[in-house]
C-alpha cells in the first residue's frame, strides 16, 4: 500500500510539475528520500517546496483550515474520509495525468 501511495504521489507530482515551475508538496517526514527529491528537481528544472508533517492531527489541522496551497498531499487512510467530506482535497482529473498509463489500476 505504501508503494502504491508513493507511486501515485510521484506520478501526481510529475503531472503537476508538467505545467508549473514550482510544486508544493506536503508529506510524511522521511517518506521520500531527499536524494530522490533533488534528482527530480535536477532532471525537471522544477523547484520543490517540500514540507513535512509527523502526525495525522497536524495534517488534518492544516488541510481543514483551507488554502494550504499544496499541489500534492500524501495523507493516510485513517483521517482521509473526514478530510474528503470537508472538501480539503480536489479530485484528480485523469486527463491531466500524462503518466497515468504507468499507474496501477488499483
Feature map (PLM): residue ranges:
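Sec/Tat signal peptide C-region and signal peptidase I cleavage site
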Residues: 16-20
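Hinge/lid segment of periplasmic solute-binding proteins
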Residues: 81-106
